Amino acid sequence: APDPSSFYPYVHCLACRGILGGYACGAPGEPCNLNHDPYFRPGALITRGQIAKIVSNSAGLSDDPGPTQMYEDVNSFNPFCVWINRLTHRGYMGGYTCGIAADEPCVPPANMPYFRPGSNATRGQLSKIVANAAGLIDPHTDQTFTDVPRESPFYVWIENLASRGYIGGYACGGVNPQTGSSEACDGQNRAWFRGANNVTRAQAAKIDANTFFPNCNPSVR
């Protein structure tokens, strides 16, 4: 991430701690410089497996969850298995019931759920995982975002992060770039959270760093 990037402090904060890394130079469009520095790909979407690794490491979870397989699609050969199991064991992360999606059949006798480690993570999912791992589960009654009412399944976690300045939204009156839907202003001109939108690597780094390492950003309360 270049210095002018608004995400630089967060990416740098996590990279210096060995929590996240990049991609070796030399791929198409990513030439090597004299130092052969890697590329971070800040605009690339982040997956559920990658999120599990970053959040688990940021929370300092280092226990061995054991050999038990918790998801049909995450066996011991999966590169994210340890981190996924650490979060799942604590109830910070979950999966999808087998048999609902056509390509996720139930396999007897365990009929385990599916994790979908390669699927893109959403802003709502990331908020839940980060807030849970950080122990931010205080009850709330206020509504910060137009599209996150108290009935939202992610309401508690989003409000816990938003109330501390760890996560923000988008000013009303615009258009959601991923869905194309308009985001009208309500009577209080509240921002929109866009909880179903996919998260980029840079956005995930910012939310994670704000929550677990707030000293990386002096503006965070």
Annotate each language-model stretch with its function.
Residues 11, 52, 127:
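Generic structural marker for isolated residues within well-ordered, non-membrane alpha-helices
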Residues 18, 91, 165:
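Phosphate/pyrophosphate-binding loop motifs in nucleotide- or prenyl diphosphate-using proteins
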Residues 9-17:
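Short, compositionally biased
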Residues 1-6, 21-49, 57-83, 93-124, ...:
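Feature responds to low-complexity, polar/acidic, surface-exposed segments characteristic
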Residues 167-168, 207:
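C-terminal functional regions that serve as terminal interaction/effector modules
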